[in-house]
């Protein structure tokens, strides 16, 4: 059997409030429910998936630094840091691990300040507006890219 790919899902600020915060935009499911379903999907693909959520930019950066040479792919929903965090972008670039940027809502159909991302130009791809299915799409695409690169 081939070695398992190792993926990390990183979720930024306020995503711990999913299911309570603006369900019309983000849905009624909790982050725990979404990550549990994604972990099951990863298991079926022979992928070792871990996930991490923090409201702290520092904690997110440190977790990214910890992935160096330990993770094959990152799926990140930087949430509000999408529009503000050069430091988080630089952390991703420093570990040189491919990543997908995921957003539950369609950020381009929202307020103008949400249209700019510090990540999209260095991401392998951007998935937005699909709700929790965006994580599944990123998982499948990451596995496909990893399989095709080996």
From Swiss-Prot:
<dbReference type="GO" id="GO:0009423">
    <property type="term" value="P:chorismate biosynthetic process"/>
</dbReference>
<feature type="binding site">
    <location>
        <begin position="104"/>
        <end position="105"/>
    </location>
    <ligand>
        <name>substrate</name>
    </ligand>
</feature>
<feature type="binding site">
    <location>
        <position position="90"/>
    </location>
    <ligand>
        <name>substrate</name>
    </ligand>
</feature>
<feature type="active site" description="Proton donor">
    <location>
        <position position="103"/>
    </location>
</feature>
<dbReference type="InterPro" id="IPR018509">
    <property type="entry name" value="DHquinase_II_CS"/>
</dbReference>
<feature type="binding site">
    <location>
        <position position="83"/>
    </location>
    <ligand>
        <name>substrate</name>
    </ligand>
</feature>
<comment type="similarity">
    <text>Belongs to the type-II 3-dehydroquinase family.</text>
</comment>
<dbReference type="GO" id="GO:0008652">
    <property type="term" value="P:amino acid biosynthetic process"/>
</dbReference>
<keyword id="KW-0028">Amino-acid biosynthesis</keyword>
<dbReference type="GO" id="GO:0009073">
    <property type="term" value="P:aromatic amino acid family biosynthetic process"/>
</dbReference>
<protein>
    <recommendedName>
        <fullName>3-dehydroquinate dehydratase</fullName>
        <ecNumber>4.2.1.10</ecNumber>
    </recommendedName>
</protein>
<comment type="subunit">
    <text>Homododecamer.</text>
</comment>
<dbReference type="InterPro" id="IPR001874">
    <property type="entry name" value="DHquinase_II"/>
</dbReference>
<comment type="pathway">
    <text>Metabolic intermediate biosynthesis; chorismate biosynthesis; chorismate from D-erythrose 4-phosphate and phosphoenolpyruvate: step 3/7.</text>
</comment>
<comment type="function">
    <text>Catalyzes a trans-dehydration via an enolate intermediate.</text>
</comment>
<dbReference type="Pfam" id="PF01220">
    <property type="entry name" value="DHquinase_II"/>
</dbReference>
<dbReference type="GO" id="GO:0003855">
    <property type="term" value="F:3-dehydroquinate dehydratase activity"/>
</dbReference>
<keyword id="KW-0057">Aromatic amino acid biosynthesis</keyword>
<keyword id="KW-0456">Lyase</keyword>
<feature type="active site" description="Proton acceptor">
    <location>
        <position position="26"/>
    </location>
</feature>
<feature type="binding site">
    <location>
        <position position="114"/>
    </location>
    <ligand>
        <name>substrate</name>
    </ligand>
</feature>
<feature type="binding site">
    <location>
        <position position="77"/>
    </location>
    <ligand>
        <name>substrate</name>
    </ligand>
</feature>
<dbReference type="InterPro" id="IPR036441">
    <property type="entry name" value="DHquinase_II_sf"/>
</dbReference>
<dbReference type="GO" id="GO:0019631">
    <property type="term" value="P:quinate catabolic process"/>
</dbReference>
<feature type="site" description="Transition state stabilizer">
    <location>
        <position position="21"/>
    </location>
</feature>
